[in-house]
């Protein structure tokens, strides 16, 4: 039964993924495949925003999130040494060894023709809840009192600092949960920090 999943001639070893005989016929094969998850298109997308003003100070924020969505990691994210690549940190910390028998991921294995013999089948091990909550924007500003500006012929001056993508709460490792590209080959959302002035004449 293992050969159908991993290829003819494969010898099961300690640390390989264990498969469930879903149909209960004593054989693990393609008939045991089943649907899992909600897909990688979120069923719920939401935002939370707010603002506060006190005297000359102002504050605003925007949270963005998604729910009821999942992502299946594949490619270089879950395949150690894929295409002569590196070893993702999650494999270093959480792959099976004789000293770490309760690890989340299967054992590390050598690469053959650019594809590792580590089990990379479509299994629940690599399926993650891709729900997330991200602080998309936060800004603090201060408007100078008009009496300070009379001599400069300026009617208004506001100083502000803001940040984008400051932090994200998510269970997905290695990749940006907002990005449905599941192999980690695209850049994540970048943090950005700005300081600025708004002038009125």
Give short role names for the model-derived ranges.
Residues 1, 87, 95, 101, ...:
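C-terminal beta-signal and terminal closure region of outer-membrane beta-barrel proteins
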Residues 47-49, 137-141, 194-196:
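Membrane-embedded beta-strand positions in outer-membrane beta-barrel channels/transporters
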Residues 53, 64-66, 162-166, 200:
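Outer-membrane beta-barrel pore domains and translocons
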Residues 8-13, 66-158:
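Extracytoplasmic gating/loop element in the C-terminal half of outer-membrane beta-barrel translocons
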Residues 61, 159-161, 197:
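Membrane-embedded beta-strand positions of outer-membrane beta-barrel proteins
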Residues 44, 55-57, 131, 153-157, ...:
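Outer-envelope beta-barrel architecture signal
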Residues 1-38, 100:
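Conserved small-residue
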Residues 56-61, 147-148:
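Repeated loop/turn-to-beta-strand initiation elements of outer-membrane beta-barrel proteins
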